[in-house]
Design a protein with these regions (language model features):
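Active-site environment of divalent metal-dependent phosphoester hydrolases
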Residues: 27-29, 77-82, 107-110, 126-129, ...
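Short active-site oxyanion
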Residues: 1, 94-100, 160-162
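Cap/insert and terminal regions of metallo-dependent hydrolase folds
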Residues: 48, 99-102, 169-256
Length: 266
């Protein structure tokens, strides 16, 4: 298994011989806009309203990122996970014939309206070739959820179980997913993004520690860093915080463009 950190929550994953692009937010630096330009739907802290997102450019040309992709996984339709055009269509940079896996019929309809032809809602037994794709729960906010989101389990007999936690905080369902699936590799979105009404939207260092303590030796990867205005933890902050918690050797935090490789017996 190879996992390449692209940017924010966008990952390029080669698993059991197939390549998935996860949460393909492929806009150039600043092209998505600011919280103010997005219409004030979300209330954020002072000082973050006018920061253009994404805050960093892609590490490679878009066409290189898309090269060799067999299917896409979109955990939820938010503007930092999939490109949303002014007319409301989504995923403009993607080949509309690519197989696409989503969390719900609502998200599937959004992709179909945008011209995609092969959209599958993930359930307990969804498959891409012989790879099992299972939607698992996520809670996208400590106060109230910032819309629906999901995690995804990838399972194949020749690979470690991979758990993409998605946009979630630590809560009982995450612990249950860890107990049920015993993943060998876990990806956590963990910049502690914060909105006034919804609270903290995804994991912070304390949540990362809870996962590490619960996962019995799995490789833990921190993603979704350094690209959204409402983040409250940067990569540099997270590195310090993990060291203070004694987790600097237990957690991997890849740079944009970096590839991580995990053996089948992980």
């Amino acid at each position: 298994m190879n996992i390449q950190q692209i940017r924010n929550a966008t990952l390029k994953i080669t698993y059991a011989g197939r390549t998935f692009l996860v949460d393909p937010w492929l806009a150039g630096k600043g092209e998505t806009g600011t919280f103010r330009s997005l219409g004030g739907v979300f209330r954020c802290k002072d000082g973050t309203w006018d920061i253009p997102m994404p805050m960093c450019d892609l590490p490679f040309p878009r066409e290189d990122i898309l090269k060799g992709v067999d299917a896409c996984i979109c955990t939820h339709v938010h503007p930092d996970h999939i490109d949303i055009s002014p007319d409301g269509t989504i995923g403009a940079a993607l080949d509309s014939t690519l197989p696409l896996f989503v969390q719900s019929m609502e998200d599937a309809h959004a992709f179909v309206r945008s011209g995609f032809r092969d959209v599958t809602v993930m359930y307990e037994n969804s498959r891409f070739d012989d790879i099992l794709l299972v939607r698992v729960p996520a809670r996208h906010g400590t106060k109230i959820p910032c819309g629906p989101a999901c995690g995804v389990i990838l399972h194949h007999p020749d690979e470690p179980v991979l758990y993409l936690a998605g946009d979630t905080i630590w809560y009982d369902a995450v612990a249950q997913t860890l107990r049920r699936w015993r993943p060998g590799v876990i990806v956590l979105n963990a910049c502690a993004a914060f909105l006034l009404d919804e609270g903290r939207l995804i994991m912070d260092d304390a949540d990362v520690e809870k996962v590490v303590r619960a996962c019995d030796g799995a490789a833990v990867i921190v993603s979704h860093m350094d690209n959204v205005a409402h983040a409250t933890i940067s990569r540099a902050d997270m590195k310090k915080r993990l060291a203070e918690r004694g987790l600097e050797t237990r957690v991997i935090m890849p740079d944009d463009g970096q590839i991580l490789t995990f053996p089948a017996d992980r």
